[in-house]
Amino acid sequence: MISNLAHVDPSAKIGNNVTIMPFAFVDKNVEIGDDSVIMPYAGLFNGTIIGKRNTIYCNAMIGVEPQDFHYKGEDSKVIIGDDNKIRENVVIARGTYTDGATRIGDGNFIMEKVHICHDVVINNRCVIGIGTIIAGNCFIEDEVIMSNSVVLHQNNRIGTLALIQSGCRVQNKSKGWQR
């Protein structure tokens, strides 16, 4: 169901059984997979591709222009897999360069007010806590849990099964769970 109060560009590709609620914004060159829900006031901007069974909550802005001096209006993307929950007021910037992309895998839970900068990769089954900031070009492996208000410095890599405590500033690579 697509509300007649939503703005959906005619070029957008909308899957089966997608719900787009009133006042949501779906820009040109956006793809939304089957069984996804886009809540009121969410924005999916040019070059955003989301897979199946995703829920994008109120006021989330996905595919915004990156805040990077290198960005000159290139055709870049945000690519999101399946089964993600992206909560209220999350911002996800697209890639910086032509054909660049910010990528979110499958089964992630991204809580309120998270900011994910340009060219970030978040693999699968991660939890990103409220108010966390992930700077550009970071890579987060599978099943990482980042508690609330974590600041991840640019060009970082967080290993599989890492647990990052609330309020931490991470400037160095984290290897994740080790035996």
Question: Which sequence ranges carry the predicted segments?
Answer:
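Structural signal for interior beta-strand "rungs" in well-ordered beta-sheet cores
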Residues: 2-178
